[in-house]
């Protein structure tokens, strides 16, 4: 098993109003983090944003960073679009777990992490802020 940290929406040291902004995500990537991002697809345009579509991006932006992104599709059109790509994406609402497009278990923060899963926001129990711990099996 391997531990790794994934920045949650670009956050690495607490929640800020900058989360999901493209330059903020790039800052986290530049520091060596993978980043979980939230995307929306509305009117043939892609956006970053958690509760609503805020920052317009395009597929090239995602492609240029694809080795570092964990893409959370926030609406059904975003999920349908991602299914046409080789990007690493997932969808969940209130499900206990979901499976990413790369076959990794993504556990909802409301449940105890599973072995070999991504434990989302474990700081609720261990005191870390806005970081996602990942347990990935190395083959």
Predicted regions and their residues:
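Phosphate-group recognition and catalysis centered on beta-loop-alpha active-site segments
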Residues: 1-139
């Amino acid at each position: 098993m391997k531990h790794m940290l994934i920045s949650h929406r670009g956050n690495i040291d607490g929640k800020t109003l900058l989360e999901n902004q493209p330059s903020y995500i790039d800052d986290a990537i530049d520091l060596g983090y993978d980043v979980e991002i939230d995307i929306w697809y509305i009117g043939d345009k892609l956006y970053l944003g958690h509760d609503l579509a805020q920052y317009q991006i395009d597929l090239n932006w995602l492609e240029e960073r694809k080795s570092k992104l964990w893409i959370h599709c926030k609406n059904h059109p975003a999920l349908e679009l991602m299914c046409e790509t080789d990007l690493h994406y997932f969808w969940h609402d209130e499900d206990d777990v979901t499976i990413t497009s790369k076959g990794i278990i993504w556990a909802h923060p409301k449940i105890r992490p599973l072995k070999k899963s991504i434990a989302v926001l474990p700081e609720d129990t261990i005191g870390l802020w806005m970081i996602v711990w990942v347990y990935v099996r190395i083959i």
